Amino acid sequence: MADRQRALLLGAIALGALALRLSHQWRWALWGSDSGEYLFLTAALVGEGALLQDGYLGWGRAYPWFQGMQILAASAALLCGTPLPATLFWLIPAAGALAVPALFLAGRRFVSSDAALVGCGCYAVAFPVVYANSHAMPGGLADPLGLLLVYAFAGVLAAPRRWAPPFSILLLGLLLMHHFTLLLAVAGCTGMLALETAAGSRRRAPYFALATAAALTALYWIGYATGFRTAILGDTGLPLGVLLGAPLVALGAMRLLAPRLPLPSLQAPRRPARLFLGAFLASLLIIGYGIVYDVPGTSIPVGPDAVPFLLPPLGWLALAAAPGLVLAQRGGWLLYGWTLPIVGLAAVGGLTGSHLLIAYRHAPYLMAPLALMAGAGFMALLRMQTPPHRPRFAASLASILLCGALTAYPPVAVMGGFQEGTTNAELGCVLWTGQVEPGALIVSDHRLSSLAFGLGKHNASWEQGADVLVSAGIVREVSTPAAGTQEVGYVLLSDEVRAGVTLLQWEAAQPLSAEAAAKFDSATYSAVYDSGRCQLYRQAPDSLM
């Protein structure tokens, strides 16, 4: 394929990815379950001219300490004179779509340009990527930076002096933006270095680059982001010294052991189509596991309704199942070095039930290297076709990707009952909470709590108000995430919340029981605002009962 054709096709894929990520902005009043908190922090930055960190009363313990997204959105709104909510909710997912050209740049380090282009097409419609990054969130904006960090580190492996400055700049950007993206990007770089060392490289500069990255990350996470440090120490149960020393010890051990790591020589299969078909059928068994045993590390069932939405990504992921074809590429081993640490961290999260390394959160990050592997597999199959049959063969992949685009937003029932979209009725009810007396606690599920906090400027309950919502009895007090124990003032309910109360990330949303729903018709709860499909109830104080 000529360079001009390749550039035009990449542009078309990037525009398609942009349109796909923004498509749900037209379907909902707001899209994104944490939008309220992000808007609250961004508005505080614009209004006060300083980052709100200490004393933050929201749910996200990491949000105040990683405000790169808020800085970008606030700067754009001030410079362009655009409304802050529109700037945040449209600019961030649009900027996140730059991950597609970023993947193409990174992909050319590992596979051919055509294979990287095919990988971009797969990545652009992968529903774990689209769904996760289609709303304003730091992870979506950090996605292009993470891919570019991998790209720069591949350059550090070959030409350290030239690529160390870009690597450092991207590292600093990720430090400000998103901790989880930084963790997985650096983990991928570490895996690449391990296999590069096993292949015979003795350069010291890449080790210095990763040691510097580990030191800067430790300084930021442990030294500066005090609230985040408390969360890490509490969730892991590890001593501070272990967290500080573990990355450097791991790098030292890798420096000693990686040269002794044997790299097997794998031949490219003569009939890869059979291997790809077998991989696709095996993936169906994995779906069956999810139906029987839930998503690893969670209590969220997959369910047979998810099968139509999983088939398109599984169709192209099967093309990544030929290691011999991948290793025949210019950077095949490096590509596996990028992938395997992410797989390992996901496995740890799934096996231990860790709430820091939730297994399904790794899926969007795995899609990038796997898409490049799939691109290599597809190009190998394409070359095996006779010239007259190649257009039809390419059209078959295009049809799979089109199906992927059409199924990139699974319904609530498929997503464990989790609802990312906010209706006009819910938004109107949330905005009305601005008339509620200051200091009153509003109880709702995770999504509406975020909006009541961010738009209504009220303390909210998030998952800690579960008993107020789901129990048949009356609950008077709630322990909030950061504002201490407070008396319940109001309860915010909508038809969507009644259909599925979203609480913890690792538990499926459950509908309100008939007994729990009935109590809101009692004298204890009076509807002070009713938009038809969303109600704000005032809970009577105990002294009045």
Regions found by a protein language model. Give the residues of each.
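Active-site lumenal/periplasmic loops and adjacent helix-entry segments of GT-C-fold
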Residues: 6-147, 152, 360-365, 415-422
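Hydrophobic, aromatic-rich transmembrane alpha-helices
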Residues: 193-194, 247-292, 311-331
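Transmembrane alpha-helix segments characteristic
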Residues: 14-16, 208-216, 266-298, 327-352
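Membrane-interface transmembrane helices that cradle and orient dolichyl/undecaprenyl
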Residues: 147-163, 192-201
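Extracytoplasmic
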Residues: 101, 109, 139, 376, ...
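Membrane-interface alpha helices of multi-pass inner-membrane proteins
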Residues: 163-179, 190, 211-222
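Hydrophobic/aromatic-rich transmembrane helices and adjacent perimembrane loops
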Residues: 183, 308-319, 354-386, 534
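Transmembrane signal-anchor helices characteristic of membrane glycosylation enzymes that use polyprenol
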Residues: 3-33, 216-224, 282-287, 403-406
